[in-house]
A protein has these predicted regions:
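GST-like domain detector, emphasizing the conserved glutathione-binding G-site
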Residues: 1-124, 131, 138
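Active-site-flanking alpha-helical
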Residues: 20, 74, 162-163, 203
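Short, solvent-exposed turn/loop segments enriched in Gly/Ser/Thr/Pro and often Arg
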Residues: 34, 154, 206
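Residue-level recognition of oxygen-bearing side chains
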Residues: 68, 185, 198
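GST-like fold's C-terminal all-alpha helical module
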Residues: 89, 98-195
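A late-sequence structural motif
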Residues: 196-197, 201-202
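Acidic/histidine-enriched, glycine/proline-rich intrinsically disordered or flexible terminal extensions
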Residues: 206-217
């Protein structure tokens, strides 16, 4: 098995990678990278030239991008059944929903940043508009407990993190929510998967890591 080192911050998407590592039962080390100068330092830029977290070092190979890291880990621990079989149609569905998430992210942040919407802009952009993207996901989750198949997968780590961030975390930090009404389908999905023991362990880690960074500040 590879030796894993995760570079992350508790208030970043790296928390989803911690959750995934715990679901996998992986052995790993964590290096906390404070926001600001440390993340743009020469030492860290040698790890990730983008100067962002998370980054996962597997032996001497560095992986970045949360979706890529989570998918890689699912493949590394086949006994955990966190990704459909490679020769299955469900694996194709997995890739479809993995790539679909970009519509949600772009459209969601457009909403947060109050980017003006119009029919002309919807025709011009290369990703789905907010209403269509989230309606597509909402309709899917109204019929399914999981993003793909009939069991929890790496995609549920990714999507739970994404939806939780938009619906619950951002408002807690004073950022206007992307939805102006209750979202029972999304809330039920978030509640279902944040009830997992590995998520609770991840939140405990995040609290401890945040306290550690505060002491270092």
């Amino acid at each position: 098995m590879h030796r894993f080192t995760l570079y992350t911050h508790p208030y970043s998407r790296g928390t989803n990678v911690v959750w995934m590592l715990k679901e996998c039962g992986a052995q790993y080390d964590v290096k906390l990278i404070p926001f600001g100068e440390a993340m743009k330092s020469a030492d860290y830029l040698a790890v990730n030239p983008m100067g962002k977290v998370p980054a996962l070092k597997a032996d001497d190979t560095v992986l970045t991008e949360t979706a890529a890291i989570i998918t890689f880990l699912a493949e590394q621990f086949p006994d955990k059944h966190l990704i459909p079989a490679a020769d299955s149609l469900a694996r194709g569905e997995f890739y479809r929903w993995l790539c679909f998430s970009i519509h949600l992210e772009y459209a969601g942040f457009d909403k947060i940043n109050r980017v003006p919407d119009s029919s002309e802009r919807r025709k011009a952009i290369g990703y789905g508009d907010f209403d269509t993207a989230f309606a597509t996901l909402r309709n899917h989750l109204a019929k399914h407990d999981f993003i793909v198949g009939d069991r929890f997968s790496a995609l549920d780590v990714y999507y739970t993190g994404l939806l939780n961030h938009f619906i619950r975390v951002m408002p807690m930090r004073g950022i206007p929510p992307v939805f102006v009404t209750d979202e029972p389908v999304f809330s039920a999905y978030i509640d279902r998967h944040t009830a997992r023991p590995a998520f609770a362990e991840t939140m405990a880690w995040a609290q401890q890591a945040a306290a550690e960074l505060e002491k270092q500040a």
